[in-house]
């Protein structure tokens, strides 16, 4: 029998074993060496196959699918530099916790380091970024089927956060007789094929990191910080903080409703800092804090203890406060540490929180006055909630736009918000948004900058046939205008940092068959959005705004509120 037949049986078992751990989505790039994996995935009716010709975009598509579905997602690519193109999405998953399985086809050992085409050293290519790295042997009947099933089961049982890299060498021939062969090798697993469970079951204990003296701590003056979390968690954290009468400072990714909006404006005010200096305990839920002023306050605050609750292992406090890193799911921790509203100092705490509400309202009034009658990226950030689709979701890009939304906007509590705020790169944002939309089949609004759109332009191909209406707003401020905030010489800043490209996106939309609009005022933008939500297709809306308007508006508002 040929290698092609057994390669197929090997790959079929590998993919089937993955499905026993809740894996439903597989993202596939074209390539010959990965043929056994591709054909096995396509033949498995438990799997939904997605394709893309660009491996970098493919990895981010899988990232978005995993982000929104909260399930593991597999990626299949051929050998060579196709593997290296997965690096950015793998790094992001390692930082934000999405579970991903990278299946990289490879040349067999005898073709390594001898000049063979498309043969690179793939074992360990991702260094320490995967949580696991598995180098499978060349498929052979001498290895029991139970060994392969057990390896996959063990890996998936321990895949709680981040990515696993499984390198899969296949020898030629990769194509050949399609007649069934080597069935006896697969049948070593008996009736497992008819079941729905793993060959090797390894239940993982669900542990909640409890604080034994919580009853004592909740009687102190606390501040709650809310970073990246799920919509359900955001709502529950907001309720928990309210019951304790503790002020909640939530960023745009917290989905808490940001009860104290415009925090990054008023946090820099000296009066506010005097109030917050009274905090005896700071509790941070989730990572990925966004605002510069919030990060500065978080770094210099000096409570008795600083706690971080996040399911991702590791240190998540750059300021290295004294306190606790509680590694567990936020929902589980809240259940184990309920808020008791009847506490001795509740009245004084309420007054303390109310004073922060006043400062938040002052900041909102400054924003309202500054943006009255204006149309630009700052206005879009401030009024973004008016553009959100009903029962939909939001994907926010990086760089200046997410800072503006975080600083000026107030998103609804429990409204799903997604982003790539692990490494916070501008690569793969369109493809990640495409994955988020495919995972949920919800109307989706994505907002990114012009350089981000150029960086992932290939992935507009992924938006051609959405399962629900999708709007991609490209804020075209002619370059990386977040660098306008840098204290550098103007000519050097434009050449080496902002890098204006002087492009329009109408031709890009046309090339990929997407609808296009370029509204000139708020009313036209609302009308374009309203029309887009009525059709199951993608509309690219380009907002051509003055280069520095957003950055200058942010600087002006920071100065205004700091001087109140």
Swiss-Prot record:
Catalyzes the thiamine diphosphate-dependent decarboxylation of 2-oxoglutarate and the subsequent addition of the resulting succinic semialdehyde-thiamine pyrophosphate anion to isochorismate to yield 2-succinyl-5-enolpyruvyl-6-hydroxy-3-cyclohexene-1-carboxylate (SEPHCHC). Its cofactor is Mg(2+); Mn(2+); thiamine diphosphate. Belongs to the TPP enzyme family. MenD subfamily. Its EC number is 2.2.1.9. It comes from Photorhabdus laumondii subsp. laumondii (strain DSM 15139 / CIP 105565 / TT01) (Photorhabdus luminescens subsp. laumondii). The keyword Transferase applies. Transmembrane segments: none annotated. PANTHER family: 2-SUCCINYL-5-ENOLPYRUVYL-6-HYDROXY-3-CYCLOHEXENE-1-CARBOXYLATE SYNTHASE (PTHR42916), PROTEIN PHYLLO, CHLOROPLASTIC (PTHR42916:SF1). One of its GO terms (biological process) is menaquinone biosynthetic process. Homodimer. This is 2-succinyl-5-enolpyruvyl-6-hydroxy-3-cyclohexene-1-carboxylate synthase. It catalyses: isochorismate + 2-oxoglutarate + H(+) = 5-enolpyruvoyl-6-hydroxy-2-succinyl-cyclohex-3-ene-1-carboxylate + CO2. InterPro entries: MenaQ_synth_MenD (IPR004433), MenD_middle (IPR032264), THDP-binding (IPR029061), Thiamin_PyroP_enz_TPP-bd_dom (IPR012001), TPP_enzyme_TPP-bd (IPR011766). The keyword Plastid does not apply. Keywords: Magnesium, Manganese, Menaquinone biosynthesis, Metal-binding, Thiamine pyrophosphate, Transferase. GO terms for molecular function: 2-succinyl-5-enolpyruvyl-6-hydroxy-3-cyclohexene-1-carboxylic-acid synthase activity; magnesium ion binding; manganese ion binding; thiamine pyrophosphate binding. Pathway: Quinol/quinone metabolism; 1,4-dihydroxy-2-naphthoate biosynthesis; 1,4-dihydroxy-2-naphthoate from chorismate: step 2/7; Quinol/quinone metabolism; menaquinone biosynthesis. Gene3D superfamilies: 3.40.50.970, TPP-binding domain. Pfam families: TPP_enzyme_C, TPP_enzyme_M_2, TPP_enzyme_N. Binds 1 thiamine pyrophosphate per subunit.
């Amino acid at each position: 029998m040929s290698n092609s037949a057994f390669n197929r049986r090997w790959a079929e078992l590998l993919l089937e074993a993955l499905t026993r751990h809740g894996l439903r989505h597989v993202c596939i790039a074209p390539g010959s060496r990965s043929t056994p994996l591709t054909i096995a995935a396509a033949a498995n009716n438990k799997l939904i196959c997605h394709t893309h010709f660009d491996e970098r975009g493919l990895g981010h598509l899988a990232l978005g699918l995993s982000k929104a579905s909260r399930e593991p997602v597999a990626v299949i690519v051929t050998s060579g530099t196709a593997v290296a193109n997965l690096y950015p999405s793998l790094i992001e998953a390692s930082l934000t916790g999405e579970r991903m399985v990278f299946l990289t086809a490879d040349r067999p050992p005898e073709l390594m380091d001898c000049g063979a085409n498309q043969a690179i050293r793939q074992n360990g290519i991702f260094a320490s970024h995967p949580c696991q790295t598995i180098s499978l042997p060349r498929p052979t009947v001498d290895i029991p089927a139970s060994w392969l099933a057990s390896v996959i089961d063990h890996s998936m049982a321990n895949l709680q956060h981040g990515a696993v890299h499984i390198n899969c060498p296949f020898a030629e021939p990769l194509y050949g007789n399609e007649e069934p062969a080597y069935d006896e090798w697969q049948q070593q697993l008996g009736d497992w094929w008819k079941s729905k469970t793993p060959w090797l079951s390894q239940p993982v204990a669900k542990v909640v990191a409890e604080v034994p003296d919580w009853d004592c701590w909740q009687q102190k003056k606390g501040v709650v910080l809310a970073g990246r979390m799920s919509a359900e968690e955001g709502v529950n954290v907001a309720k928990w903080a309210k019951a304790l009468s503790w002020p909640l400072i939530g960023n745009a990714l917290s989905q808490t409703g940001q009860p104290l909006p415009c925090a990054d404006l008023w946090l820099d005010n000296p009066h506010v800092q005097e109030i917050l200096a009274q905090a005896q305990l700071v509790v941070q839920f989730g990572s990925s804090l966004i605002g510069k002023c919030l990060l500065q306050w978080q770094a210099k605050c000096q409570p008795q203890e600083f706690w971080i609750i996040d399911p991702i292992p590791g240190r998540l406090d750059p300021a290295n406060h004294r306190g606790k890193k509680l590694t567990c799911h936020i929902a589980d921790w809240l259940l184990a540490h309920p808020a008791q509203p009847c506490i001795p100092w509740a009245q004084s705490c309420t007054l303390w929180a109310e004073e922060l509400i006043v400062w938040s309202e002052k900041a909102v009034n400054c924003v309202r006055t500054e943006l009255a009658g204006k149309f630009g990226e700052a206005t879009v950030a401030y009024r973004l909630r008016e553009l959100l689709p009903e029962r939909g979701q939001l994907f926010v890009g990086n760089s200046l736009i997410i800072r503006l939304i975080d600083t000026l906007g107030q998103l609804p509590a429990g409204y799903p918000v997604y982003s790539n705020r692990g490494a916070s790169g501008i690569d793969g944002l369109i493809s990640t948004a495409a994955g988020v939309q495919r995972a949920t089949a919800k109307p989706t609004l994505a907002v990114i900058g012009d350089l981000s759109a150029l960086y992932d332009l290939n992935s507009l191909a992924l938006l051609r046939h959405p399962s629900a209406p999708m709007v991609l707003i490209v804020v075209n401020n002619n370059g990386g205008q977040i660098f306008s905030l840098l204290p550098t010489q103007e000519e050097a800043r434009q050449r080496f940092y902002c890098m204006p490209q002087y492009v329009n996106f109408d031709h890009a939309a046309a090339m990929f068959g997407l609808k296009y609009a370029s509204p000139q005022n708020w009313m036209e933008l609302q009308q374009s959005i309203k029309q887009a939500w009525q059709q199951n297709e993608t509309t690219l809306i380009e907002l051509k705004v003055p280069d520095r308007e957003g950055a200058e508006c942010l600087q002006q508002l920071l100065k205004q509120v700091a001087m109140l």
